[in-house]
Amino acid sequence: MDYSQLMGFGPDGWGYDMLRATAMTMAVAFSGFTIGLVFGCLGAAASLSSSGALQAAASGYTTALRGIPDLLVIYLFYFGSSSVISNVASLFGSSGFVGASTFLIGALAIGVVSGAYQTQVLRGAVLALNKGEIEAGRAYGMGALLLFRRIVLPQAARYALPGVGNVWQLVLKESALISVIGLVELMRQAQVGSGSTRQPFSFYLTAAALYLLITFVSGQVFRLAETRSMRGLQRGV
């Protein structure tokens, strides 16, 4: 079977399977990225707080998650959560191993890891803010919420966008590791297809092309967002 038939959308083609796996990759990557953004906001807030305990917790979180291999984090989440679920199920008479949702575990693992990187990105963005504008807002009588919404958030988002875009690209690549726990995303589908047809090069080449396509499109989206965020600044220069 030639490449066009193998990756086609006919009865013997794998085109639909690869597209479904691509959609799954994007879904788990976006979910993990969003979870990581939440962890990143919390971590950045803790690292910038006046509390020594919160600063230590944020530092420990980023140091640990950036030091542990991502694959090991995925295994810890999967087997740890599955063990807890199995123990709880045994209380109700169930026996044997009960696996957790691979999508949920994968998204959580990616989110916790990416959150460590997003913590640093968001912390740097806040530290880069124009302190004069913040003091001017306070002098004008702005409350904390209004000050955050009108001054801190717009500027911090502008400074954070390049770093957040880099974290998104990292998350896309990390999503391939979730194949080890059985989630049928792009890498897992390529493994299944290559094993079934004994044509691994065709499947991994297609997977690489699809990853590059996702990376290129998302890179353009972030580049456009960065350009739009700088418009007001450029007009003011």
Curated annotation (Swiss-Prot):
It is found in: Cell inner membrane. Disulfide bonds: none annotated. Keywords: Cell inner membrane, Cell membrane, Membrane, Plasmid, Transmembrane, Transmembrane helix, Transport. CDD domains: TM_PBP2 (cd06261). InterPro entries: AA_ABC_transptr_permease_3TM, ABC_transp_permease_HisMQ, MetI-like, MetI-like_sf. Component of the octopine active transport system probably consisting of four subunits: Q, M, P and T. Belongs to the binding-protein-dependent transport system permease family. HisMQ subfamily. NCBIfam families: HEQRo_perm_3TM. This is Octopine transport system permease protein OccQ. The gene is occQ.
